[in-house]
Amino acid sequence: MKAIVKRRVEDKLYQNRYLVDPGRPHISVRKHLFPTPNLIALTQVCPAKCYQLNDRRQVIIVSDGCLECGTCNVLCGPDGDIEWTYPRGGFGVLFKFG
């Protein structure tokens, strides 16, 4: 009888690899004095936890671990709070399934 191995989401995400394009992030947050409610929501709903509030209460992004799932684009793209494009060819997330 095989033992059932339960794996956490974090363990599976750890298997992914990233090719970062230095100096060319594929996501940027529009400059703002006060973050919109949708930007604040991104700090909670981004599955890779790429969005954070800094010490000045500004939403910032660290896109190095981005899964390119598009959650942020759906939530904030139509309002112009973020600018989202696909990474250049050969860069971005490399999914490892299994």
From Swiss-Prot:
GO terms for biological process: nitrogen fixation. It comes from the Bacteria. The keyword Iron-sulfur applies. The keyword Transcription regulation does not apply. InterPro entries: 4Fe4S_Fe_S_CS (IPR017900), ETF-QO/FixX_C (IPR007859), Fd_FixX (IPR012206). Keywords: Electron transport, Iron, Iron-sulfur, Metal-binding, Nitrogen fixation, Plasmid, Transport. GO terms for molecular function: iron ion binding; iron-sulfur cluster binding. PROSITE patterns: 4FE4S_FER_1. Could be a 3Fe-4S cluster-containing protein. To ferredoxins from P.putida and C.tartarivorum, ferredoxin I from A.vinelandii, ferredoxin II from D.desulfuricans. This is Ferredoxin-like protein. It comes from Rhizobium leguminosarum bv. trifolii. The gene is fixX.
